[in-house]
């Protein structure tokens, strides 16, 4: 299986956080070019440190290992820390040409889907939005797509791994199904987040 991941960061609307502040958070997106399998995570900022953390996260979140990534030329992806992380994980990194975001069109189109299918829903807090994003991540990986000959990303992954089990990612860590949806209390607050972000895992 080709393991070329398209990665991007999308700012989310300003909403109330668990500590009561109103500010932006950032959606980190990784989509596999071949299967269209997607992984999402929300972080507090668009920084090299969070880009490095997300890169490490997707090495466990995909059922197959991501060996190549394509990013835009944002500062978080051109930072030395991110380059070193790619080298450490033996991930080949490429960036888009300057001023040509369409070069990373697959993830840009997915971001458009998020904008039209998720961000148009009225919510009052980041906690509520992250519940929607988690559910959307799960639903998208199970959605049949014409480009995949009527299969879903999840079905595509399963078939290819059945055909060649050597492609399986030994570091893959599926989430507990009970933890797929973040728990939101009556105030709209989530439980304590880890490293400033709430992950949106999908268990294929």
Give a label for each model feature:
Residues 1-15, 84, 100-101, 155-163:
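Basic, flexible linker segments flanking DNA-binding modules
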Residues 2-3, 89-91, 113-204:
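C-terminal domain-tail junction helix/linker
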Residues 4, 28, 68:
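Hydrophobic "anchor" residues on beta-strands that sit immediately upstream
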Residues 7-38:
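An active-site-proximal beta-strand-loop segment
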Residues 23-24, 40-64:
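Active-site beta-loop-alpha junctions of metal-dependent nucleic acid enzymes
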Residues 37-41, 94-96:
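Short small-residue beta-strand/loop micro-motif enriched in glycine and branched aliphatics
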Residues 41, 68-72:
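Short catalytic-loop micro-motif centered on adjacent basic/acidic residues
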Residues 71-73, 77-86, 93-116, 127-134, ...:
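RNase H-like two-metal-ion nuclease catalytic core shared by retroviral integrases
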